Amino acid sequence: MFSYDFMQNAFFVAICISLLCPCIGIFMVLRRSSMIGDTMSHASLAGITLGLLTNTNPILGAFIFTAICGALIEFLRKYFSHHLDLILTIILSLSIGTAITLISSGKLKANANVFFFGSILTVNATDMISIAVLTILSVLTLYFLYNSLLYIAYDEEAARVAGVKVDFINYIFAILMAAAV
């Protein structure tokens, strides 16, 4: 089975993703915002369609749009802290609506379904390198911010009083979530 290059590539990417996702996911669950993953994945759909529409790299488009949505979620969460579920629903609806509108326009340069429902078996060397770099950078960032992220996850106000740069770390974490999606 591992004598085929595509299986080796798929196995390597699966290992990288299986290292990255739990490291980020644990903080999402601790912050009681596990639905943010669903919102970010729908935001990536809109980013992919924007990338295809502008004839740029759809993966880059997905990252940029998802990072913007993550930053928007954090910005709105600061002002409407008790309404995270409402914020996530609004961003999710905005993202899915944007994706459907762009797909329905008929102006996409490629088939969006190829990117939506891809296969891990079709990963190439460029994808492997970018996923490995992303995993290493994200895990290192989480390692260095671990104590602050844990403090914020349990009591954001106490972390703020203790001198933790809560807003800055929340924005970094939003970008890490966007990159993982």
Task: For each feature predicted by the language model, list its residue ranges.
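Helix-boundary and loop/linker segments of multi-pass membrane transporters
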Residues: F2-Y4, I120-V123, G163
